[in-house]
């Protein structure tokens, strides 16, 4: 089994030109936060992630195996809710309320995205945004203090 042990830095990514022929590993957001994980590559082979704790992979990252193989990370499509509006102040308010609930959130111009949750959908609709449930790639914002993406536990942090 191939053992991927490191993420190639940005300089290495910029110099890597064979993206069309490299191995691909397609991972959900939850899987991209795991430092130890058994995965299936696009060629059907099994591989293992053995990455430093706290590593959060993003679409486009390159992984390098102990034996030299390189794999491109792709974000898997997941069931998500995409909230949208042309009113950017309204979008900011929705992001504030979702953030207050420790919801990992992807924020883009005119829309935000989170893992589907009908209770959150109702709250966001109540604020006046449209909500579309769909299968899409999901890449939430990293933690503001350089931490990993969290929120799945819905725990409270005390500072």
Swiss-Prot record:
Compartment(s): Cytoplasm
Role this protein plays: Involved in urease metallocenter assembly. Binds nickel. Probably functions as a nickel donor during metallocenter assembly.
Main localisation: cytoplasm
GO molecular function: nickel cation binding; unfolded protein binding
GO terms under cellular component: cytoplasm
Pfam families referenced in this protein's UniProt entry, alphabetically: UreE_C, UreE_N
InterPro entries per UniProt: UreE, UreE_C_dom, UreE_N, UreE_N_sf
UniProt cross-references to HAMAP family, sorted A to Z: UreE
Protein name (Swiss-Prot/TrEMBL): Urease accessory protein UreE
An annotated GO BP: protein-containing complex assembly
Organism lineage: Bacteria, Pseudomonadati, Pseudomonadota, Gammaproteobacteria, Vibrionales
Entry similarity comment: Belongs to the UreE family.
Annotated keywords: Chaperone, Cytoplasm, Nickel, Nickel insertion
Entry keyword Chaperone: yes
């Amino acid at each position: 089994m191939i053992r991927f042990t490191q993420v190639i830095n940005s300089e290495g990514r910029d110099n890597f030109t064979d993206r069309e022929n490299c191995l691909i590993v397609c991972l959900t957001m939850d899987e991209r936060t795991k430092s130890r994980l058994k995965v299936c590559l696009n060629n059907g082979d099994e591989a293992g992630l053995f990455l430093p704790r706290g590593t959060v992979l993003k679409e486009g990252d390159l992984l390098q195996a102990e034996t030299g193989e390189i794999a491109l990370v792709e974000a898997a499509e997941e069931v998500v809710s995409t909230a949208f509006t042309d009113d950017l102040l309204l979008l900011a308010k929705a992001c504030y309320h979702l953030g207050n609930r420790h919801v990992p959130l992807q924020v883009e111009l005119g829309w935000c995205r989170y893992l589907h949750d009908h209770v959150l959908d109702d709250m966001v609709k109540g604020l006046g945004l449209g909500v579309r449930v769909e299968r899409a790639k999901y890449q939430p914002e990293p933690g503001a203090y350089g931490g990993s993406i969290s929120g799945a536990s819905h725990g409270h942090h005390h500072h």
